[in-house]
Amino acid sequence: CEFTLAIAYRYQWDEYSVPTYPAAGVSAPIHFRAAWVLSIAEALGGAVTMRIAGGGKPVSFSIGMFPFDLRTLTIVGGMPECAWMYWARGQIDCFYNPQAGYSMMLGTQAKRPGLQAGYEKGVAGAVGALTGCDDLHYIGVLSFDDIFSPEQMAADIELCHLLDHLRRGIPRDDPQEWVAVIREGLEKGYMQVDTTLD
């Protein structure tokens, strides 16, 4: 088990990391809020244990969770709940470590590139972009994490560019210039004015 290895090699490592990823309905309660409480308790307990067992070496931890489909007996990456769980994970991690980043998985259950992969990855990415995510991962990955597709990777890179544009929002400009900008195109329209062409 991981704990036995950590103890056996504790003098060789400078720091430890304790992640938790229970599956709701299998290794955690099906009710998400209760599952989060369990996941937090596991991470904090593991971090304290490793801090003591490691002789006071630094310990980081990340709290996570995945939805589980009891019909197919698989962790699923394309459900809306997965995007929500990644968002909640980011909030919890930032509570314990204000410098922590927030990552969103572009997950899908699709087995090949196409409509299902596009909308599942797009929903997760949009949630991440609109809620402050600073990292998108699982580029080119399909079937949760079983298949890599170069074609899907190309589509995901384009999606990331689009989501980055969405995340940046409408550019801020100087309100003092608005009247001049409006006046510039009143007679001929705005297609050929300097501000449009710039």
Spans of model-derived segments:
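Glycine-rich anion/phosphate-binding loop at the beta-strand->alpha-helix junction
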Residues: 1-159
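Catalytic-core signal marking the mid-to-C-terminal active-site face
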Residues: 151-198
